[in-house]
């Protein structure tokens, strides 16, 4: 196949399935028990994956040491997001329709505290020191700070528009809030909202370069906008070939991967120094959720029920793995042992072995998919925590 040129977003690479290093077919699902027994690492990851079951109204705690559900933790509401603290044995779940935050103890796998912060919420982020939890609320339109020691609302900052996305800088001093009309910075110590950095239909936002720059996806104009945080001004607009719906940074933060409507591709952006679009790599069908290991990029294709795996170094697709029905979220464990794929329609989590993909030593090409674990109704978010 010829390689098309001339796209605004840079080079486009096309790959035939026959040219992939390996493609795992759906019939490998029948071989999962054998494959898992032969390929599971001798030392399993010691920890849990906490999975938010949106329609089940619960968190499923999956013991990653034995690859089985340890407990279902019922919640009052439909969870959409779960975050694990690194410094404390705690996990936080958000139920947007009730505007509530739920705290779960990792050692007991039980709900410990619950706090209603708004009538409706959208998303949440932990502060770097894990002393505060910031909740972005739809009703009322506000950024809300929760003090985690007392588990009470510390302050609320009203917002001019219905918010969409939230990001918190690594130093914990600045937040960014996007909306369908603009993107703003928030001085967290002063509890002050900046003037709009830019006008447009913004979606995902991400701090970069130790919080010195802000990357903002303008979905209305298919732009990646880069702003200076200190100067509160635009650095550049980068036209891209997809609507910027999802962001994912490489571990070294040297590459930003973008997926969204408009093209079956992943756009690769180099955000350091002079930000520029690098490559546009064809991958999957209507690609969506992403996550990375040190060397690999995992990209979910909800419509086709598979995950495309790319080498970050070469930006080539090296595998396509069928995982289930409607994969919509990916989380790689901190030790790069497992990639967890949440399948919303089939209500399960597919566990991929990252070393099996990286080393490519399995002659039958079935080692990557270790097992599929039923976890509940419509799993949509996961957080992994070592113990």
Residue ranges and their predicted role:
Residues 1-24:
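Secretory targeting signals
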